[in-house]
């Protein structure tokens, strides 16, 4: 059974065949339908739609359940995410192509179908695969270029439903969450107090991806092939994305490579500057790393609450929730000498 909808595999397969046969105007064969690992918030399914010896590699991204808990984890709705991906593509950002946004008559719940792009997304493979050695050497620079493209998308092109999130708003939201979850960690409160007293450099507002990190980029031997998972996108300070990418939690053990575990600050900022014409100082990026560590703490607390309340007792929720102490260690290291 799949998520809370109790949609069986055979029913999912049947509904997909009917939908894809309509999309591709012919009786398709559905090959290799399988759920991909990872993804604490969404279900991700890979498949190939085959018609007349032509194969269409696809990804289905859908809500895992009838109860919409997107507000609790801070996500935009999937229809808006699909719209945003299309807008990003129109502005030169490497993203999958949106094939279809699900509607109730499709019988598949809430979600969308998109093209399955080549490349690897698993962080450990990106960091260790010998075939990606040359790609890793320029990956931080390429990430900087991609982020600058995202941040340059005119705000008037962005869906109006996207939230505008300022630094003060972030601090207030995190305080509410801490209080709601009993505020049992003095480290988290210490870090939040520091962030409240030390606001980052103000920047002109831009589209912020919100989850740009190792694990949400597809990489092959030539470099970045697609940027994934736009569910946390919002309008805010563009340097947030740069700091988030450099968060210790997304280095996967490669602590000496601050950019995603594969690169250095200077390479990231050089790539950003090459497209945007400017780049923040490293210290400004590191300031946002503190926000990243606090955001990770909020994510862990939220997942833990979903699991404990049995609102979603999946192993993915529990696995993230148990990592709460990591954020405390990261925050103490980041704040060392600042408080």
Task: Report residues per predicted region.
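Catalytic-loop of the protein kinase fold
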Residues: 207-209, 214
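Juxta-kinase regulatory segment immediately upstream of eukaryotic protein kinase catalytic domains
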Residues: 1-27
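ATP-binding pocket architecture of kinase catalytic cores
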Residues: 34-192, 197-204
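Activation of the activation-loop gatekeeper triad in protein kinase-fold domains
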Residues: 228-233
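Active-site activation/catalytic loop segments of kinase-like enzymes and analogous catalytic loops
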Residues: 241-277, 291-310
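Conserved protein kinase catalytic-loop anchor
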Residues: 205-207, 225
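All-alpha amphipathic helical-bundle segments outside canonical DNA-binding/catalytic cores
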Residues: 162-165, 279-291
């Amino acid at each position: 059974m799949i998520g809370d909808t109790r949609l069986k595999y055979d029913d999912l397969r049947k509904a997909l065949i009917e939908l894809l046969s309509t999309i591709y105007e012919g009786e398709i064969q559905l090959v290799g339908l399988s759920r991909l690992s990872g993804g604490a918030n969404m279900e991700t399914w890979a498949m190939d739609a085959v018609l007349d010896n032509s194969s269409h590699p696809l990804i289905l991204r859908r809500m895992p359940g009838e109860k919409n808990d997107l507000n609790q984890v801070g996500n935009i709705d999937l229809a808006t995410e699909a719209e945003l991906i299309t807008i990003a593509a129109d502005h030169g950002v490497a993203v999958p192509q949106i094939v279809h946004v699900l509607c109730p008559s499709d019988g598949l719940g809430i979600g969308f179908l998109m093209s399955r792009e080549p490349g690897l997304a698993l962080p450990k493979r990106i960091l260790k695969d010998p075939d990606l050695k040359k790609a890793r050497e320029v990956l931080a620079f390429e990430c900087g270029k991609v982020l600058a493209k995202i941040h340059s998308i005119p705000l008037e092109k962005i869906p109006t439903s996207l939230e505008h999130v300022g630094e003060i708003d972030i601090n207030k939201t995190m305080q509410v969450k801490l209080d709601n979850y009993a505020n049992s960690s003095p480290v988290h409160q210490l870090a939040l107090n520091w962030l409240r007293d030390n606001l980052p450099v103000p920047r002109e507002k831009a589209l912020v991806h919100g989850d740009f990190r190792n694990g949400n980029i597809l990489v092959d031997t030539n470099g970045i092939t697609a940027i994934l998972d736009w569910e946390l996108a919002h309008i805010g300070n563009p340097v947030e994305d740069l700091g988030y990418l450099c968060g210790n939690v997304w280095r996967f053990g490669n602590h000496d490579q601050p950019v995603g575990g594969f690169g250095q600050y200077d390479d990231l900022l050089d790539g950003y500057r090459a497209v945007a014409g400017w780049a923040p100082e490293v210290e400004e990026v590191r300031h946002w790393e503190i926000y990243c560590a606090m955001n990770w703490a909020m994510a862990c607390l939220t997942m833990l609450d979903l699991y404990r309340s049995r609102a979603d007792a999946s192993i993915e929720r529990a696995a993230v929730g148990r990592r709460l102490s990591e954020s405390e260690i990261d925050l103490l290291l980041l704040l060392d000498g600042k408080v």
